[in-house]
Amino acid sequence: MPELPEVETVARDLRPLLVGRRIMTCHFSGKKLRLPWRDEWLAEVCGCQITSLTRRAKWLHLSLKKTGLPHGAGLIVHLGMTGQLTVVQTSADHSPKNWRPQDHIHLRMLLLSGVSPEDSLYSELLYRDARRFGGIHFFANQNELDIFYEAHPLGPEPWDCPLVDWVGKLAGTSRRIKTVLLDQKIISGIGNIYADESLHAAGIHPTRCANSLDHDEAARLLAEASGVMLRAINNRGSSIRDYVGGENLRGNHQDYLAVYGREGLACVRCGGQIQRLRIGGRSSHFCTVCQRFRKSPGRKKGDNYKNIVNTRKKDQA
């Protein structure tokens, strides 16, 4: 599944190719997607100008502008497990009749770069999704967008998460730390790949209970998660299966993964063996040496979230 680094790469690739373009035509395959598309949205989208492209966690947000369309209208895109959002050059006489089922293209938009067809270049925005676990959602105004995000609450991204809040969240749950990293309501953007990589970088076993981590371990994990994600962004994400960037180019970070997908191989840090186990139905990769399971002394009795916050405030006074 594309995670934050992959989605950020798509956003960076597509921003100069989409912003300022006008959507001339829009065609939908009619296939059922997890995030369903409605046929009545086709008329709303046609004629719109794309004014911005932003990312929030694993979501892409395209702002749209058109006469008669309320302020705040736009599109939300989630790539799911196998989704791809790419732009290709085309001509004005493109035809959706040439679609082939094996291409798995579910939405395509003809884009115009100039004011008039005579002095414009044409391109197509394509949404592919073999497993159809993603999708594109249209919202007509800011209120609809706010309602959408209320139904899909997101925690802060690793670099935006205050340490005191992070420590408090871990102190308040006995769930396994790998499971907590995947909870988008607690911390957003991390998926299976970068959860494994973050835990390895921090030297923490994935089955540890979150509330067994002491303050230093929690701080180290948050810092390593930020570093892991930023390095992956610099390498254009990890192309392990279907992922490609917005210009249909593969990422490079799969060549630098320390544990994910390396079962049975030697740890790049200590030489220990990489093993795989199942946690909550997901594969987890870890080093048997530098992530050896051990009971942490944990927090002292009464060292709960409230006390941590009060201590932090006293330190800052």
Regions found by a protein language model. Give the residues of each.
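Structured catalytic/nucleic-acid-binding cores of DNA maintenance enzymes
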Residues: 1-317
